[in-house]
């Protein structure tokens, strides 16, 4: 059993993560404000001292706190996604954390196959495969902030020996939400089919992210479901952390 601190625990991925880990680990949810039904440590990721105090005595940090809006303005992502992530890494170092799982995103590579460069959540009809180690091509300030977060984690891994997993998370939706999205224009529906992450696969992926022995650090892998329309590779995720996705958007929308 590990002691795990989860920032951004009230978000969609955060709630799934806390539920997935709570049965086998001692989980400390961390949120920006009180949330109904969630007993959490309340703090602002812009407060490094508060983060350090919250991380003390833990083994692993799962850093999910961020402004996740791909249309967010620069000031918003700068303060939370960039400044806040720096604070999380500094606090993790001060608290002697063993592993940090950083919630990155498919948006670090989305410009490779975007249908409309002004609309991050669209996908071209002729999408080509993008490898995990291909150069970043973010589609938004949000994507830029996650490229920074990955690079920062790589630095802390190489400089300080912190075990770092950059987890490029797709779009967490229920099956019903996926079906609803199919009524939107085709470039959006195509994006959803490619980037879907089911709740069940998200739970499994987050468990593997904290429990698997990493073959290398820093390490970056994708976390989406086994969608027929995906252009991001899951080979590295399966090999590195033993992820075995069970869901496929094609079976949901057929």
UniProtKB/Swiss-Prot annotation:
One GO process term, biological-process aspect: L-arabinose catabolic process
Binding site for NAD(+): 142, 146
Comment on activity versus temperature: Optimum temperature is 45 degrees Celsius.
Annotated keywords: Arabinose catabolism, Carbohydrate metabolism, NAD, NADP, Oxidoreductase, Plasmid
pH note: Optimum pH is 8.5. It shows 50% activity at pH values of 6 and 10.
Family affiliation: Belongs to the NAD(P)-dependent epimerase/dehydratase family.
Full protein name: L-arabinose 1-dehydrogenase (NAD(P)(+))
